[in-house]
């Protein structure tokens, strides 16, 4: 479980403002509901909306504070959608009442409904969407490396395609292919026609190679693009080609096609990085 860090909220203007407004709105609806329940009949359904929304707000605080929005965004949108239904129904049952306490509670539920709509639009959008990139960019210069200990799930946008990274062709010697030669007298093979004295001298036609085929990815020489990390990423320890980086870090990128980009850090470390964790500058 990623570590909860209050600076993830305090350094993000969008998260700080929406969470603060939601807490104020919940307090208004809660106090208004208490007064209305004491003075007159109060719909029990509204109490469920009050209890449900405090749980949703607490969940948002935990998700944003631990920098796991990419992991739990689908669940968050589902809970917010249900909360929007509850708050709007509570508004409908209170806003038309003559008691000022009920109207105050309705005002709190209206604010909660507005915040729910904003959150659904934010958490329901992909990190590549323009409005979300604009919102996230506001926090980059303030938070810095506060998200260093978090690691969103890299499998969220699918496995890395094998064709997205170029790799030099592997050359094999005849010694490495020993055992694959055919013993049948077939013409057209480099060893010559059947009966030729060069038939079994295939191994001498190729110079021996002392270097084993490498699985390392070829490194480009130019990095014309610059990108900034909108999330922290920890490289897979089983994949030597991936690199780790922290939120707000600037990387040099050689190719922006595909879901994995060849990137270089400021310390000279090179490797591949998931494109949905980066934003081009």
Swiss-Prot record:
Residue ranges constituting the SH3 domain according to the UniProt record: 222-281
What's a GO cellular component annotated to this UniProt protein? plasma membrane
InterPro entries for the chain: SH3-like_dom_sf, SH3_domain, Sho1_SH3
Compositionally biased region (Polar residues): 201-219
Where found, per UniProt? Answer: Cell membrane
Q: Name one GO biological process term.
A: regulation of actin filament polymerization
Top-level division of the source organism's lineage:
Eukaryota
Q: Where are the annotated segments for Disordered?
A: 178-219
Topological type in the membrane:
Multi-pass membrane protein
Instruction: Check the record and name the SMART domains matching this protein.
Output: SH3
Question: Could you tell me which residue ranges are on the Cytoplasmic side of the membrane?
Answer: 1-14, 66-74, 125-281
Span-the-membrane segments of this chain are 15-35, 45-65, 75-95, 104-124
UniProt topological domain (Extracellular) ranges: 36-44, 96-103
Task: Tell me, in one coarse class, where this protein mainly resides.
Answer: membrane
Q: Which UniProt keywords apply?
A: Cell membrane, Membrane, SH3 domain, Stress response, Transmembrane, Transmembrane helix
Subunit structure, interactors included: Forms homooligomers.
Q: What does this protein do?
A: Plasma membrane osmosensor that activates the high osmolarity glycerol (HOG) MAPK signaling pathway in response to high osmolarity.
- Family membership: Belongs to the SHO1 family.
**Which PANTHER family has this protein been placed in?**
FCH AND DOUBLE SH3 DOMAINS PROTEIN (PTHR15735), HIGH OSMOLARITY SIGNALING PROTEIN SHO1 (PTHR15735:SF20)
Q: What is this protein called?
A: High osmolarity signaling protein sho1
The species this protein belongs to is: Talaromyces stipitatus (strain ATCC 10500 / CBS 375.48 / QM 6759 / NRRL 1006)
């Amino acid at each position: 479980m990623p570590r909860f860090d209050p600076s993830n909220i305090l350094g993000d203007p969008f998260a700080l403002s929406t969470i603060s407004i939601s807490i104020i709105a919940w307090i208004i609806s809660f106090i208004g509901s208490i007064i209305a329940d004491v003075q007159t009949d109060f719909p029990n359904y509204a109490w469920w909306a009050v209890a449900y929304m405090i749980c949703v707000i607490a969940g948002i605080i935990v998700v944003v504070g631990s920098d796991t929005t990419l992991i739990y965004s689908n669940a968050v949108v589902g809970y917010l959608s249900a909360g929007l239904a509850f708050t709007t129904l509570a508004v409908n049952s209170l806003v038309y009442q003559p008691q000022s306490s009920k109207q105050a509670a309705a005002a709190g539920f209206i604010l909660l409904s507005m915040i729910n709509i904003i959150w659904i639009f934010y958490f329901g959008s992909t990190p590549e969407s323009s409005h979300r990139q604009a919102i996230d960019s506001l926090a980059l210069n303030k938070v810095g490396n506060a998200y260093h200990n978090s690691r969103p799930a890299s499998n969220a946008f699918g496995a890395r395609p094998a064709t997205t990274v170029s790799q030099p062709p592997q050359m094999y010697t005849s010694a490495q292919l020993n055992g694959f030669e055919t013993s049948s007298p077939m013409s057209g093979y480099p060893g010559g026609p059947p009966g030729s004295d060069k038939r079994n001298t295939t191994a001498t036609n190729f110079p021996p190679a002392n270097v084993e085929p490498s699985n390392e990815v070829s490194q480009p020489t130019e990095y014309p693009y610059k990108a900034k990390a909108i999330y922290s990423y920890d490289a897979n320890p089983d994949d030597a080609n991936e690199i780790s980086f922290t939120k707000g870090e600037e990387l040099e990128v050689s190719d922006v096609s595909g879901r994995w980009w060849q990137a270089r850090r400021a310390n000279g470390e090179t490797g591949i990085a998931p494109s949905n964790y980066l934003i081009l500058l």
